[in-house]
């Protein structure tokens, strides 16, 4: 779902996006999408909290590109069901808490994109209320309010839920540190590790839709500046700040060694997309935002044959690691490049169509 807007819509193939959205709708179950599709005779696996939330963003991007009301009318009842499942609770203790924030997780499960697991060891446990999950949830509620308007259905419930989430989201902000908590209400309390997930609280388009941004303008700038100082490398954002005691800046060794550092300092290429979009939103400087993509262009020509790598080491010279052709990375570079092109030419359609 993260890759869908970039690999289809930004690449000039929105009809593919529509087909994929329809196909995935057939696999919705208890308000969730599978992260592993079945082989013949097997069942899909549902162990991700964010896939369904990225599905909403993919739908928003598709409608922005096509204004295909037919598809929206077909899938809208299923989207209503998704929201209701999250309100009452679904697998893995995923549920909407009283503070308006989504809680997700049970011991031994890895439900976010930071999903490395070795045997029974979850390397990056994020049980609780991960920040990007709640930024995505707020985004989904704003999208639902807009889509309800498209199909002529009431939007008040989604606006009410979004207002609750906005209020609860203020708990993430740490004034004394100038950045956001990564996970609230975990088994051992809040996790204030400096990780890149907070960039989605600035980058996602919810502020352009029905409700206010989750963070103030000053807070957004602080998040972007903090990520620039501590997480930004030539090819993306580090998964953990270098001054954290668990930081690992090199990636190598056997599978155990590699998985143990996968999200503990390794640079992820796909995160360059939300970072560039967040930077553009805060500073409105398309030339500077575009400059962040230049190393990826160099990498495209000098390292891989027509594609972009999955990850890079957290320490200079940021050697490429992982798979040499990663859909997330390619998709996010394409998507944010298109965003920059539109910004440069000042083509700004209606709020939902961005």
Regions found by a protein language model. Name each.
Residues 15-16, 71, 78, 154-157, ...:
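Alpha-helical positions within canonical tetratricopeptide repeat
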């Amino acid at each position: 779902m993260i890759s869908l807007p970039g690999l289809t819509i930004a690449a000039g193939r929105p009809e593919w996006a529509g087909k994929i959205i329809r196909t995935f709708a057939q696999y919705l179950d208890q308000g969730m999408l599978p992260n592993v599709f079945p082989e013949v005779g097997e069942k899909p696996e549902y162990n991700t909290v964010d896939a369904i939330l990225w599905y909403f963003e993919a739908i928003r991007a598709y409608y922005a590109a096509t204004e295909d009301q037919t598809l929206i009318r077909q899938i809208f009842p299923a989207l209503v069901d998704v929201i209701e499942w999250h309100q009452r609770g679904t697998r893995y203790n995923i549920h909407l808490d009283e503070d308006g924030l989504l809680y997700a997780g049970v011991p031994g499960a890895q439900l976010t994109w930071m999903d490395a697991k070795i045997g029974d060891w979850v390397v990056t446990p994020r049980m609780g209320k991960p920040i990007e999950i709640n930024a995505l949830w707020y985004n989904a509620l704003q999208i639902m309010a807009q889509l309800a308007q498209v199909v002529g259905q009431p939007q008040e419930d989604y606006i009410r839920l979004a207002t609750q989430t906005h209020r609860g989201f203020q708990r993430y902000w740490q004034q004394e540190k100038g950045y956001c908590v990564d996970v609230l209400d975990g088994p051992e309390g809040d996790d204030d590790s400096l990780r890149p997930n907070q960039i989605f609280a600035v980058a996602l388009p919810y502020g352009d839709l029905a409700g206010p941004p989750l963070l103030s303008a000053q807070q957004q700038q602080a998040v972007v500046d903090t990520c620039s100082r501590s997480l930004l490398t030539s090819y993306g954002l580090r998964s953990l700040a270098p001054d954290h005691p668990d930081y690992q800046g090199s990636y190598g060794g056997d599978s155990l060694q590699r998985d143990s550092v996968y999200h503990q300092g390794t640079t992820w290429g796909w995160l360059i997309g939300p970072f560039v979009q967040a930077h553009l939103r805060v500073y409105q400087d398309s030339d500077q935002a575009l400059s962040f993509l230049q190393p990826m262009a160099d990498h495209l020509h000098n390292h891989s044959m027509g594609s972009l790598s999955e990850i890079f080491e957290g320490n200079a010279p940021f050697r490429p690691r992982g798979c040499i052709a990663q859909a997330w990375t390619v998709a996010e570079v394409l998507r944010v490049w298109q965003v920059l092109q539109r910004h440069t030419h000042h083509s700004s359609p209606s709020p939902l169509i961005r």
